[in-house]
Amino acid sequence: MANHKSSIKRIRQEETRRLRNRYYGKTMRNAVRKLRSTTDKAEATAMYPGIVKMVDKLAKTNVIHKNKANNLKSKLAIYINKLA
């Protein structure tokens, strides 16, 4: 256990951030899963901007890497374009 007040506070903050990052990461993964399970092009096209916004925010806050975000957006766009 940490001895300094600032160290104890830092531990508290890190735990809060870790839980928040896990929540947002899981929410993003579920949204991507939902889009990938969709077979309707109109529905997928409507969902795509919201998912892109979510992915970009997570990349900006370093929850996910920026290259992963770009790869994910690209793969989802390809998936939507392949839908008939």
Curated annotation (Swiss-Prot):
Gene3D superfamilies: Ribosomal protein S20 (1.20.58.110). GO terms for molecular function: small ribosomal subunit rRNA binding; structural constituent of ribosome. InterPro entries: Ribosomal_bS20, Ribosomal_bS20_sf. Transmembrane segments: none annotated. Keywords: Ribonucleoprotein, Ribosomal protein, RNA-binding, rRNA-binding. One of its GO terms (biological process) is translation. GO terms for cellular component: cytosol; small ribosomal subunit. SUPFAM superfamilies: Ribosomal protein S20 (SSF46992). It comes from the Bacteria. Binds directly to 16S ribosomal RNA. PANTHER family: 30S RIBOSOMAL PROTEIN S20, SMALL RIBOSOMAL SUBUNIT PROTEIN BS20C. Belongs to the bacterial ribosomal protein bS20 family. This is Small ribosomal subunit protein bS20. It comes from Bacteroides fragilis (strain ATCC 25285 / DSM 2151 / CCUG 4856 / JCM 11019 / LMG 10263 / NCTC 9343 / Onslow / VPI 2553 / EN-2).
